[in-house]
């Protein structure tokens, strides 16, 4: 039987090297993440007067992405001023945003 003092030391050592992901983040961390996603998606949309529609949706870590719906006006000459809607996927690993038109979601 191991020494009673050895067990906590072994558990502590294993916990520091274990690849188990954190199960929760602080409220401040989630708020910062939402702000980062919003800024990246608004910028990537290319829409004039871009704004989020609803809230940022964070998928679990197995997906590694967050999503946002962005509305605004198209700047391109043929569609200038028309309302546009884009779906944005934010990759949490690369911290990059990709957008695709989502006008049919109206």
Regions found by a protein language model. Give the residues of each.
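Positively charged n-region of N-terminal signal peptides that target proteins for export
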Residues: 1-6
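Bacterial N-terminal signal peptides
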Residues: 8-18
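Mitochondrial intermembrane space
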Residues: 20-106
